[in-house]
Protein backbone atom coordinates (compact mmCIF):
# COMPACT_ATOMS: atom_id res chain seq x y z
CA UNK A 1 0.00 0.00 0.00
CA UNK A 2 1.15 3.51 -0.77
CA UNK A 3 1.87 6.16 1.85
CA UNK A 4 1.24 8.98 -0.66
CA UNK A 5 -1.18 11.61 0.68
CA UNK A 6 -0.59 14.43 -1.82
CA UNK A 7 -0.23 14.23 -5.61
CA UNK A 8 0.94 17.41 -7.34
CA UNK A 9 0.95 18.20 -11.05
CA UNK A 10 3.29 21.02 -12.02
CA UNK A 11 2.19 23.63 -14.54
CA UNK A 12 2.18 27.27 -15.49
CA UNK A 13 -1.20 29.00 -15.10
CA UNK A 14 -3.25 30.49 -17.91
CA UNK A 15 -4.77 29.39 -21.20
CA UNK A 16 -1.62 30.26 -23.17
CA UNK A 17 0.33 27.53 -21.29
CA UNK A 18 -2.45 24.93 -21.01
CA UNK A 19 -1.17 22.38 -23.54
CA UNK A 20 2.52 23.29 -23.44
CA UNK A 21 5.06 20.59 -22.63
CA UNK A 22 5.94 22.18 -19.27
CA UNK A 23 2.38 21.41 -18.08
CA UNK A 24 2.66 17.63 -18.49
CA UNK A 25 2.44 17.13 -14.71
CA UNK A 26 -0.91 18.91 -14.63
CA UNK A 27 -2.25 16.70 -17.45
CA UNK A 28 -1.60 13.69 -15.21
CA UNK A 29 -3.40 15.18 -12.18
CA UNK A 30 -6.32 16.30 -14.37
CA UNK A 31 -6.67 12.78 -15.80
CA UNK A 32 -6.37 11.19 -12.35
CA UNK A 33 -9.11 13.51 -11.05
CA UNK A 34 -11.31 12.64 -14.04
CA UNK A 35 -10.85 8.89 -13.53
CA UNK A 36 -11.67 9.30 -9.82
CA UNK A 37 -14.78 11.37 -10.61
CA UNK A 38 -13.38 14.44 -8.84
CA UNK A 39 -13.46 18.09 -9.84
CA UNK A 40 -10.42 20.29 -9.28
CA UNK A 41 -11.50 23.61 -7.78
CA UNK A 42 -9.57 26.79 -7.09
CA UNK A 43 -8.46 27.08 -3.46
CA UNK A 44 -6.64 30.35 -2.83
CA UNK A 45 -5.49 29.13 0.60
CA UNK A 46 -3.20 26.66 -1.20
CA UNK A 47 -2.50 28.78 -4.30
CA UNK A 48 -3.85 26.09 -6.58
CA UNK A 49 -6.57 23.84 -7.93
CA UNK A 50 -7.35 21.07 -5.44
CA UNK A 51 -9.47 17.95 -5.12
CA UNK A 52 -9.83 15.18 -2.60
CA UNK A 53 -10.07 11.59 -3.84
CA UNK A 54 -10.09 8.11 -2.40
CA UNK A 55 -7.69 5.64 -3.98
CA UNK A 56 -8.20 2.08 -2.74
CA UNK A 57 -9.44 3.34 0.63
CA UNK A 58 -6.75 6.02 1.06
CA UNK A 59 -7.60 9.70 1.33
CA UNK A 60 -5.43 11.61 -1.18
CA UNK A 61 -5.28 15.29 -2.05
CA UNK A 62 -4.65 16.42 -5.61
CA UNK A 63 -3.03 19.78 -6.34
CA UNK A 64 -2.16 21.79 -9.43
CA UNK A 65 -0.41 24.99 -8.33
CA UNK A 66 -1.75 28.17 -9.94
CA UNK A 67 1.51 29.96 -9.23
CA UNK A 68 4.06 30.13 -12.01
CA UNK A 69 6.30 27.06 -12.24
CA UNK A 70 9.24 28.65 -10.40
CA UNK A 71 6.96 29.37 -7.40
CA UNK A 72 5.36 25.90 -7.15
CA UNK A 73 6.81 25.38 -3.68
CA UNK A 74 4.57 28.13 -2.29
CA UNK A 75 1.52 26.05 -3.19
CA UNK A 76 2.93 22.63 -2.26
CA UNK A 77 4.36 23.95 1.01
CA UNK A 78 1.08 25.61 2.02
CA UNK A 79 -0.99 22.45 1.52
CA UNK A 80 1.61 20.05 2.94
CA UNK A 81 2.14 22.19 6.04
CA UNK A 82 -1.59 22.63 6.70
CA UNK A 83 -2.34 18.90 6.49
CA UNK A 84 1.00 17.84 8.05
CA UNK A 85 2.02 15.87 4.97
CA UNK A 86 5.69 14.86 5.06
CA UNK A 87 7.88 15.04 1.93
CA UNK A 88 7.97 11.24 1.65
CA UNK A 89 4.14 11.30 1.41
CA UNK A 90 4.19 13.56 -1.67
CA UNK A 91 4.26 12.59 -5.36
CA UNK A 92 5.14 15.42 -7.77
CA UNK A 93 4.42 14.90 -11.48
CA UNK A 94 6.51 16.98 -13.87
CA UNK A 95 7.81 17.20 -17.42
CA UNK A 96 11.17 15.53 -18.07
CA UNK A 97 13.49 16.71 -20.86
CA UNK A 98 15.81 13.71 -20.51
CA UNK A 99 13.15 11.16 -21.52
CA UNK A 100 11.38 10.91 -24.88
CA UNK A 101 7.64 11.45 -25.34
CA UNK A 102 5.75 8.24 -24.57
CA UNK A 103 7.81 7.38 -21.49
CA UNK A 104 7.02 8.06 -17.82
CA UNK A 105 8.83 6.87 -14.70
CA UNK A 106 8.40 7.00 -10.95
CA UNK A 107 11.41 8.03 -8.87
CA UNK A 108 12.13 8.66 -5.18
CA UNK A 109 14.23 11.65 -4.27
CA UNK A 110 17.05 13.24 -6.19
CA UNK A 111 17.95 16.75 -7.23
CA UNK A 112 15.99 19.20 -9.32
CA UNK A 113 17.89 18.58 -12.56
CA UNK A 114 17.44 22.22 -13.54
CA UNK A 115 13.64 22.04 -13.23
CA UNK A 116 12.56 25.30 -11.58
CA UNK A 117 9.34 23.84 -10.18
CA UNK A 118 11.22 21.05 -8.40
CA UNK A 119 13.88 23.50 -7.25
CA UNK A 120 11.27 25.69 -5.51
CA UNK A 121 9.47 22.71 -3.96
CA UNK A 122 12.74 21.40 -2.52
CA UNK A 123 13.46 24.85 -1.06
CA UNK A 124 9.97 25.16 0.49
CA UNK A 125 10.20 21.65 1.99
CA UNK A 126 13.27 22.72 4.00
CA UNK A 127 15.64 21.30 1.36
CA UNK A 128 14.15 17.83 1.80
CA UNK A 129 14.47 16.04 -1.56
CA UNK A 130 12.84 12.84 -0.29
CA UNK A 131 9.55 13.14 -2.16
CA UNK A 132 8.41 10.90 -5.00
CA UNK A 133 8.38 12.12 -8.57
CA UNK A 134 6.52 11.07 -11.67
CA UNK A 135 8.72 12.08 -14.60
CA UNK A 136 6.78 12.47 -17.87
CA UNK A 137 9.02 12.46 -20.92
CA UNK A 138 8.72 15.41 -23.27
CA UNK A 139 11.98 14.97 -25.19
CA UNK A 140 14.80 17.49 -25.63
CA UNK A 141 15.16 20.11 -28.36
CA UNK A 142 18.78 19.09 -28.87
CA UNK A 143 20.35 22.41 -27.91
CA UNK A 144 20.42 23.78 -24.36
CA UNK A 145 19.74 27.32 -25.62
CA UNK A 146 16.37 26.16 -27.01
CA UNK A 147 15.06 24.52 -23.81
CA UNK A 148 13.03 27.47 -22.51
CA UNK A 149 11.14 27.98 -25.77
CA UNK A 150 10.75 24.21 -26.18
CA UNK A 151 9.09 23.55 -22.80
CA UNK A 152 6.79 26.57 -23.23
CA UNK A 153 5.57 25.46 -26.66
CA UNK A 154 3.05 22.84 -27.73
CA UNK A 155 4.21 19.45 -28.95
CA UNK A 156 3.64 18.09 -32.42
CA UNK A 157 0.44 16.02 -32.75
CA UNK A 158 2.55 12.82 -32.83
CA UNK A 159 4.51 13.72 -29.68
CA UNK A 160 1.31 14.87 -27.94
CA UNK A 161 -0.30 11.51 -28.66
CA UNK A 162 2.74 9.73 -27.16
CA UNK A 163 2.71 11.94 -24.06
CA UNK A 164 -1.04 11.44 -23.60
CA UNK A 165 -0.52 7.65 -23.78
CA UNK A 166 2.22 7.89 -21.13
CA UNK A 167 -0.04 9.98 -18.89
CA UNK A 168 -2.86 7.42 -19.26
CA UNK A 169 -0.46 4.61 -18.34
CA UNK A 170 0.82 6.64 -15.38
CA UNK A 171 -2.75 6.95 -14.10
CA UNK A 172 -3.24 3.17 -14.43
CA UNK A 173 0.09 2.63 -12.66
CA UNK A 174 -1.06 4.95 -9.87
CA UNK A 175 -3.96 2.54 -9.29
CA UNK A 176 -1.35 -0.24 -8.92
CA UNK A 177 0.64 1.98 -6.54
CA UNK A 178 -2.35 2.36 -4.21
CA UNK A 179 -3.73 -1.16 -4.67
CA UNK A 180 -0.37 -2.93 -4.36
CA UNK A 181 2.94 -1.07 -3.91
CA UNK A 182 5.50 1.25 -5.50
CA UNK A 183 7.70 -1.60 -6.76
CA UNK A 184 4.84 -3.11 -8.78
CA UNK A 185 3.73 0.34 -10.00
CA UNK A 186 7.30 1.12 -11.09
CA UNK A 187 7.61 -2.21 -12.89
CA UNK A 188 4.38 -1.63 -14.77
CA UNK A 189 5.10 1.98 -15.73
CA UNK A 190 8.79 1.49 -16.52
CA UNK A 191 7.91 -1.41 -18.86
CA UNK A 192 5.54 0.81 -20.86
CA UNK A 193 6.56 2.47 -24.12
CA UNK A 194 3.97 4.23 -26.26
Swiss-Prot record:
Gene3D superfamilies associated with the record: Peptidyl-tRNA hydrolase
Reactions accelerated catalytically: an N-acyl-L-alpha-aminoacyl-tRNA + H2O = an N-acyl-L-amino acid + a tRNA + H(+)
GO biological process, one term: protein quality control for misfolded or incompletely synthesized proteins
Residues the record marks as site: Stabilizes the basic form of H active site to accept a proton: 95
Compartment(s) where it occurs, according to its Swiss-Prot or TrEMBL record: Cytoplasm
Active-site residues, record numbering mapped to chain: 22 (proton acceptor)
Gene Ontology MF term list: peptidyl-tRNA hydrolase activity; tRNA binding
One Pfam short name: Pept_tRNA_hydro
Record site: Discriminates between blocked and unblocked aminoacyl-tRNA: 12
Cellular component, GO annotation: cytoplasm
Keywords for this protein: Cytoplasm, Hydrolase, RNA-binding, tRNA-binding
EC number per UniProt: 3.1.1.29
CDD domains with a match to the protein in the record: PTH
Sites where the protein binds tRNA: 17, 68, 70, 116
Its biological purpose: Hydrolyzes ribosome-free peptidyl-tRNAs (with 1 or more amino acids incorporated), which drop off the ribosome during protein synthesis, or as a result of ribosome stalling. Catalyzes the release of premature peptidyl moieties from peptidyl-tRNA molecules trapped in stalled 50S ribosomal subunits, and thus maintains levels of free tRNAs and 50S ribosomes.
Entry's family note: Belongs to the PTH family.
UniProt-listed NCBIfam families: pth
Quaternary assembly: Monomer.
Name recorded for this polypeptide: Peptidyl-tRNA hydrolase
